[in-house]
Regions:
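Nucleic-acid endo/exonuclease domains
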Residues: 2-149
Length: 149
């Protein structure tokens, strides 16, 4: 079951042009990973842009997080880490802080870093590229020993 929750905001006052037909604005790499997961594991409850609140680090409240992809039931958080996460020191600090908070809340956090998953970020619709992306995703999940494998 796939339930899309939330809209990625692109600035103050942003209104998704697709809202009137119930579509959301998600990044292509995010939708590709979600589609692979749904095709391979149709029984998973997958959410995009899933908010997680009431997080703590060492017992102290901290900011909530919006997960790029959440696999509910197994509490697997997938973060799509594009270029800004690599070159921005602030983003790296925020990401590490968020990682600690999510892990403390019982989430298994898996990062898909752009440079390590070129087929996932590749915009080609060719079957060979889509199969490469599928292998990248499944290899990473096996490496992380996710519970649903």
């Amino acid at each position: 079951k796939i339930v899309n929750v939330g809209v990625m905001m692109k600035g103050k006052g942003f209104m998704d042009k697709n809202m009137n037909v119930g579509m959301k604005d998600f990044r292509p790499e995010q939708m590709k990973v979600e589609r692979i997961l749904h095709e391979e594991f149709p029984d998973l409850e997958i959410r995009l842009e899933f908010p997680v609140n009431n997080l703590k680090i060492d017992g102290h409240p901290c900011a909530g997080a919006v997960l790029d992809i959440a696999i509910l039931g197994y509490k697997v958080a997938i973060r799509m880490m594009g270029e800004i996460h690599q070159w921005s020191k602030k983003s790296r600090v925020k990401d590490q802080y968020q990682l600690y908070a999510l892990e403390e809340a019982g989430w298994q956090v898996i990062d898909f870093i752009k440079d390590e998953f070129p087929a996932v970020w590749n915009r080609s619709k060719k079957e060979v590229k889509l199969n490469e992306a599928k292998e990248e995703v499944l290899d990473r999940l096996r490496k992380e020993k996710v519970a649903f494998l």
